[in-house]
Amino acid sequence: SAGTFALPSDRNQPISLVADRATFNEKTGITTYSGNVIIEQGSMKLQANSIVANMNSRKEISVITATGGPARFQQKTDPAKGPAKGQAQKIIYNAETGIINLSGNALLEQDGASIKGNTLKYSMNKGDIVAEGTPNKTGSSSGRVQIVIPSSSAKSFPGASD
């Protein structure tokens, strides 16, 4: 089975944020972090040059947008597997839906398996991934998506099922 992409305890953990600089706008609920930003929640870790965090009406982080050259995240998805690691020029994490969008040279890998494309949409709750190549001038996808599945882990690739 595909399982979920996060340890069950991760979503119940507090979110820790550190950065060189932080600015908070109380009216908009938007906090901007810049300079060596690191966000951690349970086994999830997100690193970027800049992160913008949007708060919902309950004063909880709802959407995190990370940019950097590149922004990186990792998360332990299964105690028996290595961490899932991703990187892209921009990573948008929706804490309410559990969906991570990676765009710009997006890469996701775990235990030797990898998927690479211009954009990757990764649902931590459903355990599925949508990958797209680079759009051409007409808007259709002309770039290719690259997937590597080592023979020893063909059934453990993110999104694969038994």
Language-model regions, residue ranges each:
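Mature-chain termini and adjacent capping regions
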Residues: 1-162
